[in-house]
Amino acid sequence: MITWHDGDLRPLDVARLGDRYRRYRFTDPDAETAMAGSLRRYGQLSPLVVCLRDETHEVLDGFKRLAAARILGLNTLSCEPTMHR
């Protein structure tokens, strides 16, 4: 059982972050590439917002940051869990 508290920041493994809610967003490959440049240059400035669904951390906010991290081959990203349903 994973203990979560709203507002906690946790580093989570990029490979284990789910993106099933991404289908509700428009994607822009150029914006993802630009985000990768920003992430490389400045680091991660704000956490992804995630929720736990079926024992998977699903991204709710931060899809460009997740795509950029995958482009760069990063292992972890700072994430803020939320319990809102």
Describe each model-derived feature in a short phrase.
Residues 85:
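Basic, flexible Lys/Arg- and Gly-enriched helix-loop patches that mediate nucleic-acid binding at interfaces
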